[in-house]
Amino acid sequence: MGVPLILRKTDFFANAGQAVAVADRYPQNVFAEHTHEFCELVLVWRGNGLHVLNDRPYRITRGDLFYIRAEDKHSYASVNDLVLQNVIYCPDRLKLNVDWASNIPGFNDARGAPHWRLSSNGMGQVRPVITQLEQESLKADQSANEMAELLFAQLVMTLKRFRYATDNPSANEQEALLDKLITALAGSLNRSFVLEKFCEQEQCSERALRQQFRTQTGMTVNHYLRQLRICHAQYLLQHTELMVSEVAMRCGFEDSNYFSVVFNREVGMTPVQWRHRSRKAA
């Protein structure tokens, strides 16, 4: 595999004193694998796509949040009306006396989890902050740099308050119905999920929820769950020695032959071929 593209500071920051900036992706197009000379926060507003981070695939949609380190390699593929924002920053340029490491996973090392979910309430809280931050980052004076860093501190603290682990059902009991559904789907990789039962439990209209989900994500509920399972299968095939039948079971497929058919249709190759190619590429 060739050396990935490196995104340079000089192409994204107005001057050497600027610590934070906003890079919109309206919408995000397919983007080849790359690393950076800076770090970034990625927040997805709507649509869907495949985000491959350090060789691990994630099917992303509304509310997905990533903390990307400079040395991380990632790419975007199979995008469908994917709207996201990148808040980019240079750790060495931050001047505020803030405990950045406690607010930004992986700030000092690779141990922090890169992938989180942000609640609908949290998305509403951070959107105006990002808008303000973007406005300040476009100004060419020192006070604007200082204001942008203050807003960045507010942003990362707000994200910490409202984020939750992708499959943690207890973290968003008071949150919007769509958040609950996406969390429930992420927690159903290895077992069946029945939307009708979910709607009975939440006392909501199944038809209305299906429509809301499709409007916000660009996918049906079943398609999204299938994509989550295929992404998990790709990870297991590359990083474990599990047999294909075992991978199928762990990804919610009782029939390994059916799993292979679905995998081939979604990925363009069989599970065995994927395992061989992904390991060779790594």
From Swiss-Prot:
This entry's Gene Ontology molecular function terms read: DNA-binding transcription factor activity; sequence-specific DNA binding
Broad class of where this protein is predominantly found: cytoplasm
Instruction: State the compartments where it is located.
Output: Cytoplasm
Q: Looking at the record's lineage, which domain of life comes first? A: Bacteria
Single GO cellular component annotation?
Answer: cytoplasm
List keywords of the entry alphabetically.
Answer: Activator, Cytoplasm, DNA-binding, Repeat, Rhamnose metabolism, Transcription, Transcription regulation
Annotated GO biological processes are: positive regulation of DNA-templated transcription; rhamnose metabolic process
The answer to whether keyword DNA-binding applies is yes
Could you tell me which residues form the DNA-binding region? 196-217, 244-267
Q: Where is this site: Interaction with sigma-70?
A: E246
In its keyword annotation, does this UniProt entry include Cell membrane? no
- One Pfam family it belongs to: AraC_binding
Which segments constitute the HTH araC/xylS-type domain? 179-277
- Subunit structure, per the record? Binds DNA as a dimer.
* NCBIfam families (UniProt xref): PRK13500.1 (NF010025), PRK13501.1 (NF010026), PRK13502.1 (NF010027)
Instruction: Outline what the protein does.
Output: Activates expression of the rhaSR operon in response to L-rhamnose.
Its recorded name reads HTH-type transcriptional activator RhaR
Q: What is the lineage of its organism?
A: Bacteria, Pseudomonadati, Pseudomonadota, Gammaproteobacteria, Enterobacterales
